[in-house]
């Protein structure tokens, strides 16, 4: 499955980094988007909002205050679902995505992976 981690970080103690590691361990193809340049486990963090083809799932690691302009980007990517990890919940964005036919889920990517529900 092709997954985009939005809010990627090079800091190994950040949940976005841990999620990237677990996604790779579970055999997923991972793309990273973040505000700072860098690499995570050999993957380059892309800046801005690059178009990435065939994304199944976007997992968010940015809070509502940093989600401005995200709706148009997510609609352009047209993923099957967007996971709102703890602290990223945004009912307005969730409703808009669902209206656009994109499934949303308030969940923890780490828990979903560890419990086989991803």
Region roles according to the model:
Residues 32, 84, 104-107:
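General beta-strand structural signal in soluble alpha/beta enzymes
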Residues 103-118:
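Active-site capping/gating segments
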Residues 13, 20-41:
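NAD(P)-binding Rossmann-fold cofactor-contacting core
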Residues 24, 98-99:
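Anion (oxyanion) recognition and catalysis
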Residues 4-5:
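Conserved beta-strand elements of the Class I
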Residues 75-97:
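ADP-ribose/adenylate-binding Rossmann-like module
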Residues 39-72:
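Glycine-rich, highly charged phosphate/nucleotide-binding loops
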Residues 8-12:
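N-terminal beta1-alpha1 ligand-phosphate binding loop
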